[in-house]
Swiss-Prot record:
Belongs to the complex I subunit 6 family. This is NAD(P)H-quinone oxidoreductase subunit 6, chloroplastic. The keyword NADP applies. It holds the Pfam family Oxidored_q3.
Length: 176
């Protein structure tokens, strides 16, 4: 999107806070339904980040696949489960929660210090000029198709085989 810099920065901060709040909601909310809705918020904010970075195809795929299918499947699975078993042994804070939060906080602090200590201006971003001219004539979906059929052919085929095995396994489990 061609937005002015203050509007772009405001949307970036707004979507980032939505991502952080949604992620905290996924982890901290005791009700699984609310946690699934928070996951939906995280996935929607992620797709809006893709729209801000002019990746419209990836944003549409994110919305259709993750929000439209995966998150709805999670919500249906949670709704079919017995909700009363979640509140039987609900303790507010356990030792495992403390250890996990300390590990997460230490990882977060190390990530922040690594990002702030990195000299980003020393990195040279190089591209070929003819590659930029060629990419101007192609849409995002055409570029994705070209890269999937040339540069990423083997990983694309391996992922399709893994998904096929997972689908066959799910059918075998569902039959029993």
């Amino acid at each position: 999107m061609d937005l002015s810099e203050p509007i772009h920065d405001f949307l970036l901060v707004f979507l980032g806070s939505g991502l952080i709040l949604g992620g905290l909601g996924v982890v901290l909310l005791p009700n699984p339904i609310y946690s699934a809705f928070s996951l939906g918020l995280v996935l929607i904010c992620t797709s809006l980040f893709y729209i801000l970075s002019n990746s419209y195809f990836v944003a549409a795929a994110q919305l259709l696949i993750y929000v439209g299918a995966i998150n709805v499947l999670i919500i249906f699975a949670v709704m079919f489960m017995n909700g009363s078993e979640y509140y039987k042994d609900f303790h507010l804070w356990t030792v495992g929660d403390g250890i996990t939060s300390m590990v997460c906080i230490s990882l977060f602090i190390s990530l922040i210090t690594t990002i702030s200590d990195t000299s980003w201006y020393g990195i040279i971003w190089t591209t070929r000029s003819n590659q930029i001219i060629e990419q101007d004539f192609l849409s995002n979906s055409q570029q994705i198709g070209i890269h999937l059929s040339t540069d990423f052919f083997l990983p694309f085929e391996l992922i399709s085989i893994i998904l096929l095995v997972a689908l066959i396994g799910a059918i075998a489990v569902a039959r029993q």
